[in-house]
Amino acid sequence: MNTEDVQLGMYVQVRRGFREADLRDRIGIVRERFGNHSYTPFEVQFGDKQPQELLWATEFEEWRV
């Protein structure tokens, strides 16, 4: 996914090839954007009681129902 396409509040799904097995295929909500357009990590929340994770746009894709 391109950094420019990521919107706060959108649902995303972590890619199957993600480095941490426990996050692969998980669905979360983009809560925050950091950095600038050339170096932008996103804070993604995966549940009410789960800690938020910093991910790059290349590590997830938009999730559609």
Regions found by a protein language model. Give the residues of each.
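Basic/aromatic-rich interaction segments and small domains that mediate binding to polyanionic partners
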Residues: T3-R64
